[in-house]
Amino acid sequence: MNIIYEDNHILAVSKTCHEIVQADKTGDEPLSETLKRLIKERDQKPGNVFLGVTHRLDRPTTGVVLFAKTSKALERLNRMFATGEVHKTYWCIVPNVWGEFESLKVREFESTPQTPQTLQTSALRNQTPPQEADLTHWLVRNEKQNRSYAYDERPLDRQGNPLKDAKEARLHYEVIATTERYALLEVKLYTGRHHQIRCQLSYIGLTIKGDLKYGAPRSNPDGGISLHSRRAEFIHPVSKEPVTIVAPVPDDTLWQAIAPV
């Protein structure tokens, strides 16, 4: 258990790919219950421990997970997540389809910032995606398969009407580092949809390493996928001070080699 931030109202952990945030059909103990027991023993609390779940992170995904230690913080954080006031940044490892990568140090000092392309990905079929872009798709979730499907345009139902279950999904990605075989992307979400990063990136040919569900050729040794919730930034719901929480990357050879120091 790696607690990376804690105060009187908020607790954040760096989740591993083996941990679940909330109870599911597996029957495995969720992080919320593990943390309650830890706090009760550590702080010698006589009664029940309050710990509210503010958001979820897929089981095979690693990184920052926020919990609320008070009902006031839970109510406010839930509202902040709903209104997009909690800004989360993800890192993920995908195949390096670009070859030699332009130096980040050179790009930092360009006098004119480059505006990322906004892509409707029908234009990307059989082409190499740009190193930085905004993606927009329509996602449809299949509950039985527990996966989502991406479409360039909003799909229609059998009557020819826009499919009600289709949700617009938007994100920004940028290549920030490479090795010979892999690239590290930084991803920021404009919307929060089911498996959004996994689905949208795989749709343009950038399947996350180890993500068999979305087309990766093989699993990772630890059973997880190379998608990491790197950073959460928000205004503290009680103190109103800015908070930035950063989760260290997983302790494996590839992450340690590719992630910027």
Protein language model annotation of sequence segments:
Residues M1-V261:
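RNA pseudouridine synthases
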